[in-house]
Amino acid sequence: MYKLVLIRHGESQWNLENRFTGWHDVDLTDTGREQARNGGRMLKEAGFEFDLAYSSVLTRAIRTLNLVLEEMGQMWLPVERHWRLNERHYGALTGLDKAETAAKHGDEQVKIWRRSFDVPPPDVDESSEHFPAHDPRYRGIDKNVLPKAESLKLTIDRVLPYWHDVIRPSILGGKRVIIAAHGNSLRALVKYLDDMSDAEILDLNIPTGVPLVYDLDADLRPIKREYLGDPEAIKAMMDAVAKQGQAK
């Protein structure tokens, strides 16, 4: 049996401001840092140790992973970062206030942009600061490969090759793995691992800073999946995520 731990980054500044973040690089709030540290403490208390860690190339995921490993006394752990684990790209919505966008376009339209499976938001313009080709961390990557906007389906199409080519072989090779990433890139992995339908994944909300632990069989099929922590507190965090795109 194999174990895999997923953790969504702690609260970021744009989470706090209820803005569409996507690939924009923002750091954690003080609350987010404490969420990450608490996640690390829970993992340590539960006896977890890791051999290898993965994260996106965005600061909020990198910072979360660093704080988790610091609390666990595993700062030395090898870490592989890759853009394929980035958050979903929110296109032209990047930086906009979610509630104000809902008030302007309607709750239903914003829900479709945020939570439908295969409808992306409007593309970001190539002249925008939010087009990834302008960011030095994506230097050397064909700009036609970089997204201008993504649905969850497109996010899954981006994430899964990295899972199959890199992460899965590491786990099957005996590595104990933790992945620090984002709400939608982790939803992509959860949908695949749990064989969830397109409809089922729409109702899945992943809380910030809470370790999600998988027990996997020899073929990496889930035997058990559970969050570490208080169930009522975790449910409240999930509910808060679900309400982010609603007009005030």
UniProtKB/Swiss-Prot annotation:
Chain positions of site Transition state stabilizer: 182
Active-site feature positions: 9 (tele-phosphohistidine intermediate), 87 (proton donor/acceptor)
E.C. no: 5.4.2.11
Biological-process GO terms, alphabetical: gluconeogenesis; glycolytic process
Binding site for substrate: 8-15, 21-22, 60, 87-90, 98, 114-115, 183-184
Stored Pfam families: His_Phos_1
Annotated catalysed reactions: (2R)-2-phosphoglycerate = (2R)-3-phosphoglycerate
Pathway: Carbohydrate degradation; glycolysis; pyruvate from D-glyceraldehyde 3-phosphate: step 3/5
Superkingdom field: Bacteria
Disulfide topology: none
Cited SMART domains: PGAM
Gene Ontology molecular-function annotations: phosphoglycerate mutase activity
Keyword entries, A-Z: Gluconeogenesis, Glycolysis, Isomerase
InterPro entries xref list: His_Pase_superF_clade-1, His_PPase_superfam, PG/BPGM_mutase_AS, Phosphogly_mut1
Membership in a protein family: Belongs to the phosphoglycerate mutase family. BPG-dependent PGAM subfamily.
Function: Catalyzes the interconversion of 2-phosphoglycerate and 3-phosphoglycerate.
Subunit (UniProt): Homodimer.
Database matches in HAMAP family: PGAM_GpmA
The name this protein goes by in its record: 2,3-bisphosphoglycerate-dependent phosphoglycerate mutase
Gene name per UniProt: gpmA
